[in-house]
Amino acid sequence: MTSTLRSAIALAGAAALSLGAVATSGAAQPGAGRQADEVKIGLLLPESKTTRYEKFDRPYIEDKIKELAPGAQIDYYNAAESATTQQQQVNTALAKGDQVLILDAVDAKSIQSSVQKARDAGVKVVAYDRLAQGPVDAYVSYDNHKVGELQGKALLAALGDKADSGEIVMQNGSPTDPNAAEFKAGAHSVLDGKVKIGKEYDTPNWDPNNANQQMAGAISALGKDKIVGVYSANDGLAAGIATALKAAGINVPLTGQDAQLDAIQRILAGTQTITIEKPYKPEADTAAAMAVDLAQGKDIPKSLTPTTVTSGSGEKVPAKLLTPVVVDKDNINDTVVKDGLYSVEEICTPAYADACEKTGLQ
């Protein structure tokens, strides 16, 4: 072999090693240049008793991810209201190699160690609907203090001159849900000093059965003639409350949230006054877009995180807070029907046909 040939072979080998080093270096950078079919996202939702999660949130998020990254792998988990189960599910998602977690925390505080574990593994976390503690990368939800304010204002409006003629009962959400604390604070900011609160409860796990028992206890303690209204933090609780009120022969203003189908029907029937619609699709689409950007190694654009919030553990988190809407019997068609949550046919079953006709919904 000539010296010239040896030199050519040596140069070719060096070039190959150099290219290999560059390729290895590029692979070592999480998310850098990642293609759509390499995107792996874990979706962790908290429970299924509230109808929104399986009917709306999950399919909307999954559809948007597939639209933005057609080859994406989506690993879905539902914690069934168990904080321990959700922590185990985070471990599973990390073991599967998910690059981003969309996390709706069962317990915002106890999940902090799992969020930290994800950060340590180089995995990004998008907090969805509830702001988990720990080093979260982005957050999307509704203005939850505003939700409580709207509920409180609607209750006051429905009470009218009866506001100071008796007492109201407040049934707040789960003490482990940071959103519940914000709803509660927002409602109190409106109601305090304008009504007398006879009984107030926090309701573990947002459980309608607990709400039913609490309401029955409040009726027994206060007397049914003393209760002029009920603040309910969401529609699931309102379902349990409405049953207790009906059993006691009471029909007073009752709030809610989430625009569940049964709540819309109670509004038509006159056993619930309002609910709060938080259109799920804009929230789900935003979370999906955040997650895909992070999985592909991109920065989330400012349009998706125009503000910053502070979590319970003190982290400053880029966020998008959407605007909630009050739904009453007069605007059902312009809200939940127009937004595609339900069709008139779904709402106006035979049991509610007369009420629908009276409100012009048919």
List the predicted regions and their residue ranges.
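A residue-level marker of the well-folded mature domains of exported/periplasmic proteins
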Residues: T2-L11, L17-Q362
